């Protein structure tokens, strides 16, 4: 198997803005790489063939800041080469009893008793899970799994490549769904479920923050989406959490968290709210008071 790499050099000053764009547009096949020593940055994507690579580059270009619209370079990479390129910067990481491990370590990685691994393959547009927005969510999720056990519905709203929903299943939650308004994201999520032998255990479907949350009463609802989208759909997100349930919001720049907190405080004034910050990003955890389920 071979892949086509697309590489665009971007100004290092634009790296954070481009990374935010990738998250907002859910462009899982692309990543931003920075060399802070030399002050250079690149936007890199991997695609199955030249046609897909050129189409993706053409679609992305008008979305980029003008300063980041350099001409892309294309090169075909053998399977061994593109896997090795990821091995240099992608290493296992862990929080609590869940480990996120590159699939090429599947035969050698040693898990402690009672721990679980989610196998990641960046070549499948899975990403590494290492971005602060994802890590904030999964750290909350691990803690909630210890608190709630396996009871209740877990929903990953805007699932992207499925890492949060699949992490929930690995932690033992039995009723897990994920949705995205991008058909390609749903397809990738389903592929990643197969990679982790979770196909049939997690249901993925195409939906948005209105249709995907219709009639939902989640024990845990996760939305790793940018701040403006969270604010716009605050009422839908709040209404989809059952009494005693938890809403986890991420994808929020630290400079925007007060604005998001205020918006959700208006929608859910009696909910307990707390926040954590990691790097330039913050999350919010909102807990709905236990009470009678609204019909």
Swiss-Prot record:
It is an enzyme of class 2 (transferase). GO terms for molecular function: protein-lysine N-methyltransferase activity. Signal peptide: none annotated. GO terms for cellular component: cytoplasm. InterPro entries: Ribosomal_L11_MeTrfase_PrmA (IPR050078), Ribosomal_PrmA_MeTrfase (IPR004498), SAM-dependent_MTases_sf (IPR029063). It catalyses: L-lysyl-[protein] + 3 S-adenosyl-L-methionine = N(6),N(6),N(6)-trimethyl-L-lysyl-[protein] + 3 S-adenosyl-L-homocysteine + 3 H(+). Its EC number is 2.1.1.-. It is found in: Cytoplasm. Keywords: Cytoplasm, Methyltransferase, S-adenosyl-L-methionine, Transferase. The keyword Nucleus does not apply. Methylates ribosomal protein L11. PANTHER family: ELECTRON TRANSFER FLAVOPROTEIN BETA SUBUNIT LYSINE METHYLTRANSFERASE (PTHR43648:SF1). Belongs to the methyltransferase superfamily. PrmA family. This is Ribosomal protein L11 methyltransferase. It comes from Opitutus terrae (strain DSM 11246 / JCM 15787 / PB90-1).
């Amino acid at each position: 198997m071979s892949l086509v790499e697309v590489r665009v050099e971007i100004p290092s000053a634009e790296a954070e803005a481009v990374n935010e764009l990738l998250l907002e547009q859910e462009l899982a096949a692309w990543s931003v790489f920075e060399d802070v020593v030399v002050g250079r940055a690149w936007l890199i994507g991997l695609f199955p063939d030249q046609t897909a690579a050129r189409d993706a580059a053409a679609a992305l270009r008008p979305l980029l800041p003008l300063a980041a619209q350099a001409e892309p370079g294309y090169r075909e990479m053998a399977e061994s080469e593109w896997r090795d390129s990821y091995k240099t910067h992608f290493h296992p990481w862990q929080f609590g009893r869940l480990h996120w491990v590159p699939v090429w370590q599947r035969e050698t990685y040693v898990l402690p008793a009672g721990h679980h691994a989610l196998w990641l393959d960046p070549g499948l547009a899975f990403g590494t899970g290492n971005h602060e927005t994802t890590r904030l969510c999964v750290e909350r999720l691990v803690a909630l799994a210890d608190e709630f056990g396996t009871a209740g519905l877990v929903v990953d709203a805007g699932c992207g490549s499925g890492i949060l929903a699949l992490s929930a299943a690995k932690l033992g939650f039995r009723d897990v769904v994920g949705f995205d308004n991008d058909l390609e994201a749903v397809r990738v999520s389903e592929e990643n479920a197969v990679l982790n032998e979770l196909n049939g255990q997690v249901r993925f479907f195409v939906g948005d923050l209105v249709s995907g949350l219709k009639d939902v009463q989640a024990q845990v609802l996760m939305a790793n989406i940018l701040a403006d989208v969270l604010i716009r759909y605050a009422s839908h997100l709040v209404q989809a959490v059952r009494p005693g349930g938890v809403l986890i919001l991420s994808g929020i720049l630290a400079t925007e968290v007060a604005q998001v907190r205020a918006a959700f405080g208006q929608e859910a004034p009696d909910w307990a709210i707390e926040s954590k910050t990691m790097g330039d990003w913050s999350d919010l955890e909102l807990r709905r008071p236990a009470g009678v389920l609204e019909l």
